[in-house]
Amino acid sequence: MSMSTTTEVIAHYWAFAVFLIGALGLCSLMLLGARYLGGRAQARAKHVPYESGLDSVGSARLRMSAKFYLVAMFFVIFDVEALFLYAWAVSVREVGWLGFIEAAVFIAILLAGLFYLVRIGALNWTPVRSRRETAGKSHVRLTSGKHPQQ
């Protein structure tokens, strides 16, 4: 490496080196300041997680219903849909009618998937037994002895 090339490299990267040294120095200063200036609690409750003022009872390892995971997956799917539609909305003038048709087909496919999920009961939170029990009942309440349509 010649002298002019080394000087050019140093001139090119000096700002990054100053930034890196400053960032590491600031992090070290904050960590050391917290170590020497912070309080030290030696109580038994120091290692117990905070539970909104309530004492912890039982194990934190609880079995979760699979429906929570389904809702999370649905959220991710429709969040990605929103991301694609946002990208389309930003470029709507450049893509023209062809882009509009593609977006409409995309939305139609997603709506068909949503209707399918509703039809198979993937979004239904009640147990199958209680759905069967309420299927035969009328949702009309009688306030008097007469039927509401009489």
From Swiss-Prot:
A Pfam family recorded for this sequence: Oxidored_q4
Gene Ontology CC annotations of this record: NADH dehydrogenase complex; plasma membrane
Record field: catalytic activity: a quinone + NADH + 5 H(+)(in) = a quinol + NAD(+) + 4 H(+)(out)
UniProt-listed Enzyme Commission number(s): 7.1.1.-
Topology term for the membrane: Multi-pass membrane protein
This protein's record includes keyword Cell membrane: yes
Predominant cellular place of this UniProt entry's protein: membrane
Keywords: Cell inner membrane, Cell membrane, Membrane, NAD, Quinone, Translocase, Transmembrane, Transmembrane helix, Transport, Ubiquinone
UniProt cross-references to InterPro entries, sorted A to Z: NAD(P)H_OxRDtase_bac/plastid, NADH_UbQ/plastoQ_OxRdtase_su3, NDAH_ubi_oxred_su3_sf
Annotated GO MF terms: NADH dehydrogenase (ubiquinone) activity; NADH:ubiquinone reductase (non-electrogenic) activity; quinone binding
EC class of the enzyme, as a word: translocase
Function per UniProt: NDH-1 shuttles electrons from NADH, via FMN and iron-sulfur (Fe-S) centers, to quinones in the respiratory chain. The immediate electron acceptor for the enzyme in this species is believed to be ubiquinone. Couples the redox reaction to proton translocation (for every two electrons transferred, four hydrogen ions are translocated across the cytoplasmic membrane), and thus conserves the redox energy in a proton gradient.
Protein name from the UniProt record: NADH-quinone oxidoreductase subunit A
